[in-house]
Amino acid sequence: MASSKNMPSRITQKSMEPPLRETWQQVVQEMVMRKQRDEEEKQNLVTGLQASSGDPIYTGNSSDRSTRGPGGKTKRRKGWFQWLRKLRAREKNIPSQFYPDMEGNCAGLENLTLGEGMEENPIYDSTAATNTANMDGRNWMEWR
């Protein structure tokens, strides 16, 4: 075994590192800067078209790997791939009426009505409206 005297010590001396207060100030500054930069980037995104910064379909400049644009592949990708890209791009722009949960009830949708006589049918009684005696926990446990 080689003696540890030959190896340089991997311990950081106390004098080498800055005082804690300074390092914390640096950390906080860095966090603030990063937050500001993120907010600026969010504002710069085109809100309607591009949902996230990670999704490059709608960015104006095209990268080297892209099929067209300034540094793209010389031969445009044709046929099915192009159709697929268009389709994926269109999925980002699905209007809100196809997501009824996200927005309020829109005029195009009618209220769902049960057939005649269904309202009186005890099967369709809401459980909240009935008296709570039949939903007793102890009875339920005994029944099980």
Swiss-Prot record:
Start-end of Basic and acidic residues biased regions: 32-43
Compositional bias, Polar residues, is annotated for 1-15, 44-64
Q: Which GO terms describe its biological process?
A: mRNA transport
Name the residue ranges of motif: Nuclear export signal: 106-115
Task: Please tell me whether the keyword Transport is annotated for this protein.
Answer: yes
**Compartment(s) of residence:** Host nucleus, Host nucleolus; Host cytoplasm
Q: Where does this protein chiefly localize?
A: host cell
User: Tell me, what is one Gene Ontology molecular-function annotation carried by this entry?
Assistant: RNA binding
Question: In the UniProt entry, what is the domain comment?
Answer: The RNA-binding motif binds to the RRE present in incompletely spliced viral pre-mRNAs. This region also contains the NLS which mediates nuclear localization. These overlapping functions prevent Rev bound to RRE from undesirable return to the nucleus. When Rev binds the RRE, the NLS becomes masked while the NES remains accessible.
Q: What does this protein do?
A: Escorts unspliced or incompletely spliced viral pre-mRNAs (late transcripts) out of the nucleus of infected cells. These pre-mRNAs carry a recognition sequence called Rev responsive element (RRE) located in the env gene, that is not present in fully spliced viral mRNAs (early transcripts). This function is essential since most viral proteins are translated from unspliced or partially spliced pre-mRNAs which cannot exit the nucleus by the pathway used by fully processed cellular mRNAs.
Q: How does it assemble?
A: Homomultimer; when bound to the RRE. Multimeric assembly is essential for activity.
State the protein's name. Protein Rev
Native species: Ovine maedi visna related virus (strain South Africa)
